[in-house]
Structure formats: structure tokens, C-alpha cells
Amino acid sequence: MNWHFLRTATVLLIFLVVVEINSEFRIQVRDYNTKNGTIKWHSIRRQKREWIKFAAACREGEDNSKRNPIAKIHSDCAANQQVTYRISGVGIDQPPYGIFIINQKTGEINITSIVDREITPFFIIYCRALNSLGQDLERPLELRVRVLDINDNPPVFSMSTFVGQIEENSNANTLVMRLNATGADEPNNLNSKIAFKIIRQEPSDSPMFIINRNTGEIRTMNNFLDREQYSQYSLAVRGSDRDGGADGMSAECECNIKILDVNDNIPYMEPSSHMVRIEENALSQNLVEIRVIDLDEEFSANWMAVIFFISGNEGGWFDIEMNERTNVGILKVIKPLDYEAVQNLQLSLGVRNKADFHHSIMSQYKVTATAISVTVLNVIEGSVFRPGSKTYVVRSDMGQNYKVGDFVATDLDTGLASTTVRYVMGNNPANLLNVDSKTGVITLRNKVTMEQYEMLNGKYQGTILSIDDALQRTCTGTINIDLQGSGWEKDSEKVTSSQNSGSSTGDSSGGTGGGGRENPSEGDTTTNTGGKTSTDYEDGETQTQSNNNHQELGSNNLSDNVHFGPAGIGLLIMGFLVLGLVPFLLMCCDCGGAPGAGAGFEPVPECSDGAIHSWAVEGPQPLPTDATTVCVPPIPSNNANVIECIDTSGVYTNEYGGREMQDLGGGERTTGFELTEGVKTSGVPEICQEYSGTLRRNSMRECREGGLNMNFMESYFCQKAYAYADEDEGRPSNDCLLIYDIEGVGSPAGSVGCCSFIGEDLDDSFLDTLGPKFKKLADISLGKEVEPDPSWPPESTEPICPQQGTEPIIGGHPPISPHFGTTTVISENTYPSGPGVQHPMPIPDPLGYGNVTVTESYTTSGTLKPTVHVHDNRHASNVVVTERVVGPISGTDLHGMLEMPDLRDGSNVIVTERVIAPSSSLPTSLTMPDPRESSNVVVTERVIRPASGMMGNLSIHPELSNAQNVIVTERVVSGSGISGISGLVGSAMGVSGGGMAMNSLGGGGGLSSSMGGTATIGHVRSSSDHHFSQTLGSASPSTARSRITKYSTVQYTK
């Protein structure tokens, strides 16, 4: 295929199309003028129909409205129809909005606001021409509006401080760093062209750097950088746009240039020469110190020096150790010098650095020698063994006193055998050898036996000492013996005798060599081992004794045979016998015997907290029971000096501990409690006799010895059943022994179930009378959200009781401040005696958070000679029952008043239950003053009073400071004399009752009562959403009508 022709044809075709599109058709028409007969030629031009394009550029940061209209569009379709012009794009219907607007009739486009080129460098406006139906008459037209740039942005450096480094002595024009700065103005424009300039240099001695104004490169100006002169330079550089013009904007930055160190300084030593002296055969660790000076950077490899020997140390006597922190060299003597061999030495030392020298001074470096003159001093030398060790061979056929060889010391001064020394054995394993003290001849002490051969493992290594008594010097030589051959003697008796003989001989020899001198003197001693090594010591006798000790230790160390002797076998047999004796010991052991037999386990003390049950029956712990309804036998009245403590109930519960004694008239009152719950039953009454005026109550320790009487228990529970059956069947819960709290928190087992006696087992009509105590259970069953109760941790304190004999305070607060906690002691059963009126005693309540069961029995009467422990009857026609209250009683009226002071704990509650007092002198009302905190709760329960002698209304003060306060009154039994009931005013709770007056609960925890009794502050919980507003009608004294359920705990929530 002819590609050249094809390319030519394609180019021609494209050219023809372009010409056709842009060409104009010119038609000439002859116009004949009939008048004058002339012809006119008219040129008619036909052009392609298109838009009229025009758009003027806008300058940023200026008001361009004076240039409006910046553009105008027009379509030739407007000649024969109505055209509507519309525009769209950025600045019109896209952010930023409203910059351009158009006249829809004329097509003029106007600008309305100031533009920023850095945000929008140009605008593209899409123009449309629409007819009356909204249809496009032309293709959309793109109109570009360019924004002209102005110099409104200064240069910006990428860093405020540039950091660079360069070695000293670098060549000129060496690149150090490159600065970077940019401008936000239009690129490739004069406004964004930045010129760099160094405006300051520190130190400013002479300029050392130059900068390229266009690229920002910083280079060295010369090769004179010297770190030892200046280690760092700081430059200030300015960058200006418009190529550094006067009308440009500028910015500045800092440049820190660090000069790196190179090894361009030759070290040298100070001083340049030394003279030292040293004795022969002496070693020195610090003969002379040589200091090296170097100007390079300290602690670098360019600064650390290395001192070397140039000459004079051919014998290797000296060595140099460098201290890298001080750059000081220490010359040491590591090999003894011999005066007879050399008297003077000339050492020549040189120095260099660890790092190589820089190329700039490599040619200048020359080794400079430092001379050290060493003078060797002559000393009187002792004898030495040359050579220091010898090896001999001993065979099995060599007998006692066999000459192994000789080992003679040499006098260093003369070079001949020493004649002034004596020889002794030093380390002599197995006492094998003996040495002649004068000649140094070594012989066998005894014939070598098999045991010695095995002990030495065929190799013997010992030492021989040469002692010069005149010079007080000692040298040491080493003796090596190779035991060869076989047939070593095995006679143990002979071996033992030989060893004993050799040992005594060695000891005597050692004593002769070391300490046999009569006049030992002090002096310098030289010890040479295998050469000319010398040491100093002062006492030659001590040295000899040390050698003897070494000999004995070496002999003991080699004796490492282990034998299993008779003692070890006996210990093993004894261990097995002991193991076999253990079963017999267990069979004979008395692991608990019959009671009273004298043998067995000791009882656990009652104060211990162990795993032993505190109840005296088998099975689980019995539930707490109430013994208040058990009939009490008549009390003898003719014996005033004997108190008969009759306890027919046998069932009691003690939950608190303590012991309290208090004077009652002329006698004593003793009350005992224990920190356990227990059940004691007895078929017969218990009688205890004490002195006059003294009451004694059996403790748990005494009751544990009793057994369980089922007949009595059956009688007791029958009485309880009949007592509850006589009561109103409309009670919400007929089981008073179960004290209910919030279900799931501290409730006893089975508290949800009802243990009451119900006539019909399948009758569930009792559910209609359930009280608010089951509200939480109902809420849980219905799926409602149950709010948790806040915790209330009380403080633990001790009770403070008033002194006996003080006058009762009426209307005031006595100085009694009981604190409440979980371990407070409670006096449960209190029995007044004596003729006088007893004063009130406050009893703080130790009840903690949770359910508790307390059974109490109190009684008061007229003037009683004996004080009797009596269980109170359930009902009495002439008593008011208050629980845990002790009140003074007189024969005619009640004058004793209880005044409870303000309690320090703001979350205390007040509980009044079961007050026992005669009706003849009961006051008309019970008054409780304002507690100090609105969270206090007052609960009054089971008030039984006669039909006469009391006011017939319950008045609750309306000034309750907090609507959350709760007052609950339960089981109020009143006679026909009650006139009316007034409820609670200003509170969310309704209360029904009679015969009691309470002031508002304002701020304290104190209680003031106008009747002769003591109110106990307890822990009571309820919730403010329970509204008790029942009205009790007339009832007989023996019945109780109430729809209010007893709550043992009432919780106040803010």
C-alpha cells in the first residue's frame, strides 16, 4: 500500500473540511436598471449562524462592576422569535453563588462581587438560549472569564529554621543546604518568582557562605572553615517575590549550620622527655603518666590518642594504657628488669589518633618522639629456682626413701647454687615426698600404694620452698611426678601406717622450715616461682605457716571418696520404722470420747467464730421465733430476797453481743447477750437464785447443754397458731416472725412465701389483701423497672447511758449522743426493781442494713419487791406496747421522761414499738421533736391502749420540711373514746392512727417523749411512693384493724 499517497490524501481532506467550514459564499446578482440601462453588481454574503462571544478579564481583589457588562451573548434566532438567555456554572448556581448575573432579554452578563484568583483562577459560564417553551434554540455556549493575578501573597518558607552541617576545611562552592519557599500567586508569573538573599551572618568576621538567588542553594565561599575557631554559624535569609523587586513582598528564615570536626590537628605529648627509676625485679602499675594534647573535638575518635613505642622496649618490659576520658597514657612495668642484664633503658614514644588524619594535613604529619630514660636500680636478690618446675617419674617398684631427684635454688647475684637457703616442702599431696633441708634432694616418704595412686589419679604436683633466713626471702618451685607402672601395693594397714608416718614427718618438716627459728626477724622477702618474680612480706614465720596450711588443705581437698557407712543404713531403717509406727499411733489416739469421760475435744469458746454450729439440734439453723405469747406461771411475791428466773419459752434469739451491768435501786441488773442465734428448749422452768435485787439471765453457754423437748415445742407452736388465728383475718400477712425487706437483699430464706395458717390450701383469695411489701415483687413480675435502694452504712459507736440518780429532763435534750452502727450493744430484757423511780436509759439500736428478728420481753408494774423475768402477753386492755423501750414506773403516775439528744448521724430513723405502761397515768400524747435531717423516718407500731384516759386523735405536725419523710403507724388498737384522726399535712404520705402527736421532721435525729418510756432509734426503710391513708374505725381492745403492712426497714431517698 502506498502510505505516502494515503497521508497526502488525508491531509488534503482535512484541509478541505476546514476551508469549507470557515469559508464564505459570495453571490453576485446583476441588478438591471431599466431607466438608464445599466447593470449593478450587488455582493450578498452568507455566513454561518452562531453566538456572539465576548468576555472581559476580571482583576482579583478589585471592584470590577465598572467593566460591566463583562460579556454579552446574542443568538440570531432572536430575529423572528422571542429568546430568553440563561447562564449557569461556578459563581452563578454553584459556590461561590451570585458572582455573575445575566439580563435574560439582552444577554448582558454582569459581575457583582470581588473575586480571588487563589480560590478561583477562572470561571466557566454555560450560556443557553431558550424559546418561549423553554427549549434550546442553540447549542450551549461555554464562556471563560479569566481572573487577573495581583501580588497579594508573600513568600512562605517550608521551615522557619533550616539546619545543616558541613565538615571543616571543605572546598569552596561545596553545597551546604537548599532553602525552599513558595508563593500563592499565579505560577510562572513575576508575582510568584522569589529571589533569595543572605542578610545576616553570625559570627560576622568574614562571609563564609553564599546563596543562589533563584534556587536558594547555600554553598561555601572558601575553604577556611575551622571548627576549632567557630563550631557553628547562623544565617538570616530573606526571600522576596517579583524577583526581589522593590514592590515585592518578602519573608525571612533562619539557617543554623554546624561545622563538623575532622582530624586536622596533630596530637603531641607533654612534657617532651621523662626520667624515671625502678628497682630490678619490681613491677609497677603506674611508672609515669604522659599527657596528650589534641585540639580536635573532645571524646571523639579525632581527639583520642594512641601512644606507641618507637624503640627501647625490645624485651617487652613496658606497656602503655590509655585513659580515654583524660587522654593520659600510663607507662607500666609488666616484666621484671634485671640489673645484671641492663642498667639503663632509653624509651622513644610516638603518638597518633584513633581516626585517620584528614587529607588536608596528611602530608604534614610526622612522628615526633618523646624520650623516656629508665634507670634500673640494683637490689640484693634472693634465690630462685631455675627452671621454675621439674618433672620426675616414679614407678611402683620404688620403695621408701627412694631418691627421686634434686631441686636446688640459684643465687641471682652469683648465678651459682645458693648455699644460704634451706628447703622445705610446700604443697605435698598425700605426703608423698620428702626434701632434704640443706641439699634439696627429693625422696619418697613411703612406697606408693594403690590408694595414693588412685587419689592422685596418676599425677602428682607439689611445691618446694627455698627460704633464705638472712635475707628473709622465699622462693617457690613446682615438682611434677608422673606415677607409672602397675602392681601398686594394696595393704591397707601398711598404707595407713605409712600415711600417719608421712603426715607427722611432713608436719615436723614444715615446722622446721617455717617456724623452727629461734630469732625470727622482719625484713624483705622475695618469692620466685619458676622465674624471677618477687614479692615483699614482713614475717617469714607467717609465710611458712601459710605453706603448711596449704599442704594440709591440698591433702584434704584430694580426699573426695564417698562411702555409704553403717550410720546411713541405720537412718534409712529408722525412717521405715517410724512410718510403720504411724498406724499404731493413730489406733491409740483418742479422737473424741464420751461426754464427761475426761478425754475428748475441748469445746470451742463461745467468742470464737468457727465452723461449729451454735445451735444444739441437728440439721440447719432454726429460724428465729417469737416467745411473747407463751403463758407465764404465777410469780411468787412472798420472797423478796430470791429472784426466780423462769424461762418457759426455751426459744430465744440473740443477734447482738455484749454484757451490761447497771445499778437498780439498791441492787444490780445484769444482762447477758451473745453474738449468735440459738434455740433452747426445756420441759421444765429454769430457776436461778441470786442475791436480793439481782437479776441473772442464762447465757448461750448454759443453754447449749440442754436437749430438744418435742412436747414443749408442739405446745408452743400450737399456742402461737391459736393466738394468730384469733387476730383479724384481714391482715396483709399473718406471719409476724418474717420481717420483710426488699426482696433479694438480705431477706431470710422463704420470706416471699407465706407460712400463715390458711384455712383452704387452694384458696388464693389472700392475694387480694397483700400489702405494699409485695409491691417490688409485683413490679418485677409485670416487667417494670425497679430502682435500687441506696446503701446506708451506719457508723459503729458505743451507747452512752445517763448516770443513776440524775433528775429526768422534761422538754430538753440530755447530753446523750449515741451513734448508730452495726455493732452497737442492745440491752434486750430489762427489769426494774426497787422502790424508787428509775430514770430513763437510752438504748441505741445496732440494727444494720437488712432484715433482723428481735424478740423482747418487758414488763412494768407498781412497787415490786422482786424483779421477775416475764414474757409479755399479746394483748392487754390497759397497756401501750412499745418495742425496745425501757421506762421508769411508779405506783401512781409516770414522771420519768426520756430525752434523746440530737444524733450526729443525719440518716438515722426513729422507731417506736410496743410500749408497756399502765394506763392510769399515760400522758395524752407522745411528742417527737424535729430531727435535724429531712431523711429521718419515724415509725410507730402496735399501739394498744384502753378506751379511756387517752386523747382520741393522732396529730401529725403539718410542717414537714421534706415531702419524702415517711411516718408509718401500724396496728393501732383504740377504744370507743377516740374522737378523731387527723392525717399528715404537707407530705406525700398518709397516716392513720390515734393518740400520738409528732412534730415536724426537720433536722435532727433526736426524740423527746412525754411518756415514761425510752424510744430506740432503729433502721427503718420505706419508699416515698407508698401512700398510707387508711382510717381506722372503732375496734375492741383485743382486735387490730389495719391495712398497713409492717416494714422492719424504711429507706428515705432524696
Curated annotation (Swiss-Prot):
GO cellular component: cytoplasm; desmosome; nucleus; plasma membrane
Parts of the chain on the Extracellular side: 50-566
Propeptide, chain numbering: 24-49
Membrane-topology annotation of the record: Single-pass type I membrane protein
Record's compositionally biased regions (Low complexity): 496-507, 523-534
Transmembrane domains' residue ranges: 567-587
This protein's record includes keyword Hydrolase: no
Biased composition regions of type Polar residues, renumbered to the chain: 542-554, 1029-1040
GO MF entry, a single one: gamma-catenin binding
Domain of life: Eukaryota
Cytoplasmic-side positions: 588-1054
Boundaries of every Cadherin domain copy: 50-157, 158-269, 270-389, 386-493
Biased composition (Gly residues): 508-517
PANTHER family (alphabetical): DESMOGLEIN FAMILY MEMBER, DESMOGLEIN-1
Subunit structure as annotated in this protein's UniProt entry: Binds to JUP/plakoglobin. Interacts with PKP2. Interacts with DSC3; there is evidence to suggest that the interaction promotes cell-cell adhesion of keratinocytes.
Protein known as: Desmoglein-1
